[in-house]
């Protein structure tokens, strides 16, 4: 697995659409070994989600928004 920043585990992130999440940790896809982010929703009923790390940390280009998909919540 590529080096992923372990200091980000436990941090709160905000999705560009507004939801808040906590990064629980990193995992590997069992078939492809692709690095994945495991994260928990901090709203509603919560729940765990998995997304490829490349996608979690990428910038997105959407109508009205250009920037990171998830940003660390500072403070």
Residues covered by each model-derived region:
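Mixed-charge, low-complexity intrinsically disordered regions
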Residues: 1-75
């Amino acid at each position: 697995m590529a080096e992923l920043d372990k200091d980000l585990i436990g941090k709160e992130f905000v999705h560009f659409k507004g939801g808040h999440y906590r990064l629980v940790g990193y995992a590997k896809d069992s078939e492809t070994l692709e690095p994945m982010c495991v994260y928990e929703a901090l709203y509603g009923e919560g729940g765990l989600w998995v997304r490829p790390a490349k996608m979690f940390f990428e910038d997105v280009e959407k109508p009205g928004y250009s920037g990171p998909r998830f940003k660390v919540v500072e403070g």
